[in-house]
């Protein structure tokens, strides 16, 4: 659901039914096992899981990297909506020029629980997030060896090494 007002109405209906609302936000670039474990774990904290997906523009700003994301926002959102543990997916694009999230999603839906990881937000941002959520849960990394950055860097490194090897062979 891309329209926040429509999402709010839907979440309000769930609340009327007594459902506990859980929210998490991420880039979800190069979806991998760590992401999936994290989403499954997040869903365990409530009845409805709302997943915010950072826009392409936002990722470029906060990662300070024009090469990211690898996967366009529409495709990342589509992959997330196919995950059984995810109830709603929405786009996050309220990121200021310094790359800081402005919290519009959680200001509007006021989740019972917001799930994050240690490295996702500064202490100042965590204080802000706590204002708009009844509870904030910080999960550890869900994959010891896998991250989008490691996948990208590992793949690029292998390709560069192979190209260099070919160039050396050709003289």
Predicted regions and their residues:
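Nucleotidyltransferase catalytic core that binds NTPs
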Residues: 1-171
């Amino acid at each position: 659901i891309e329209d926040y007002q429509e999402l709010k109405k839907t979440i309000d209906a769930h609340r009327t039914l007594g459902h506990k609302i859980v929210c998490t936000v991420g880039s979800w670039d190069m979806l991998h096992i760590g992401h999936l474990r994290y989403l499954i774990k997040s869903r365990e904290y409530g009845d409805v899981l709302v997943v915010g997906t950072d826009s392409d523009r936002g990722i470029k700003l906060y990662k300070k990297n024009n090469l990211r994301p690898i996967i366009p926002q529409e495709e990342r959102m589509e992959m997330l909506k196919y995950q059984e543990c995810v109830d709603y997916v929405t786009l996050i694009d309220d990121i200021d020029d310094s790359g800081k999230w402005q919290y519009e999603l959680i200001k509007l839906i006021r989740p019972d629980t917001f799930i994050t990881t240690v490295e996702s937000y500064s202490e100042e941002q965590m204080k802000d997030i706590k204002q708009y959520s009844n509870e904030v849960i910080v999960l550890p990394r869900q994959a010891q060896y896998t991250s989008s950055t490691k996948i990208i860097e590992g793949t690029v490194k292998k390709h560069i090494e192979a190209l260099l090897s070919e160039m050396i062979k050709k003289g």
